[in-house]
Amino acid sequence: KYEAAKGLYFKTRFKVNDATQSDFAVGLVITDTAVIDGTTDGIFFRKADGSTSMELVIEKDSTETTVSCGTAADDTFMTLGFYYDPKDRKFHVYKDNVKVGTGVNTNAPDNEDLAVSFGIQNGEAAAKVMTMDYISAGKERTANTEL
């Protein structure tokens, strides 16, 4: 669960076989069966069909803040990640271990439990493949009693 006073991070390494004709989402979202185009709350990376542009989405109650984070390429591994810094209250966004932007926490989902989620959807009548290498997520602990 996102909390404004605690650090939070997410990082993944993956690839998709067709960067243009696919949609994908990967990140932390509420439990939902429609991760790509139906989630209402989360902090996740998204790419829409027909484009190679990716963005970090910070969404609460269907209101989004987005941060552009570069482009995807066919069948090429990439790392995407973010770190939420409670000191400046911003999400610091990274692609291939290089900082590409920051986003404010205005629409951070602070009233929902979030789960690691990912999905791919084809954008044409052909199978699309997402290959996940790893996903890592964590949250700052501030007391010995926290798990």
Predicted regions, residues:
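Secretory/extracellular carbohydrate-interaction modules
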Residues: K1-M54
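Short tryptophan-centered beta-strand motifs in secreted/extracellular beta-sheet-rich domains
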Residues: F10-T12, D75-P86, F91-V93
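Short, aromatic/His-centered strand-loop micro-motif at the edge of beta-sheets
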Residues: I58-T79
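Flexible glycan-contacting loops in extracellular carbohydrate-active proteins
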Residues: V104-D133
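Extended recognition patches within non-cytosolic domains
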Residues: S136-L147
